[in-house]
Amino acid sequence: LFSDHQMETVWGMHNWPGLPAGEIAVSEGASMASADHFEMTVTGRGGHAAMPHQGIDPVLAAAHIVQALQMLVSRHTNPQDSSVLSITTIHGGSAFNVIPDEVTLGGTVRAFRPETRARLEQSLRDVSRLTAESHGCTVALDWRQGYPPTVNHQAEAIRAADVARAVVGADRVHMNPEPSMGAEDFAFMLEAKPGAYIWLGAGETEVGRMLHNTGYDFNDEILPTGTSYWATLVESELAAK
């Protein structure tokens, strides 16, 4: 994209349920976290559930891995350095009387700082391997690096906030809101070019129907505010040239 088209700055917007409709939030730094995900296979030796001593139980090893990984955030990460590690899938076995050969599990890791992101990956690798080995199992990890943190550039964030104030009024612009542990692919653009990513308030939603829920209903009433922001931003940027 950037090799084919010359760009000086990049700008993004996302509607944000929970923020009052028509209000705007702007961060002068990180607004959303990185998002990596992983899948691992814990391999033991299957056998009869009534004779566990004759096999190597990957279910027990996987359970201990899940528990051990929770320490990476709760005990090995500065509480002021927000991060999340969630195990979201675990599968193994198909019969009540058979210890399976393997168990697969997976999840996601979120962080705001690149060094925290890298450390959590390495720690997850080490803890999973060592825990599996302590049970006589092996582990194969497939780590997939996803989105980087969404980090606004300060100068552009200030310009975005000025435009927002011109559109909705100073009392309806929120500076440096609490960052979200969600992730955003616009982060790649912010790594390549200066820019800012804002949240446009969509108001309250029905309980349980947040973004990405199949029952989510976009608030059409915020469209004029969003389009006014874009038009005013363009006018402001062109006037400064």
Describe the predicted segments one by one.
Residues 1-89, 94-100, 183-184:
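Histidine/acidic-residue-rich, glycine-tolerant segments that coordinate divalent metal ions
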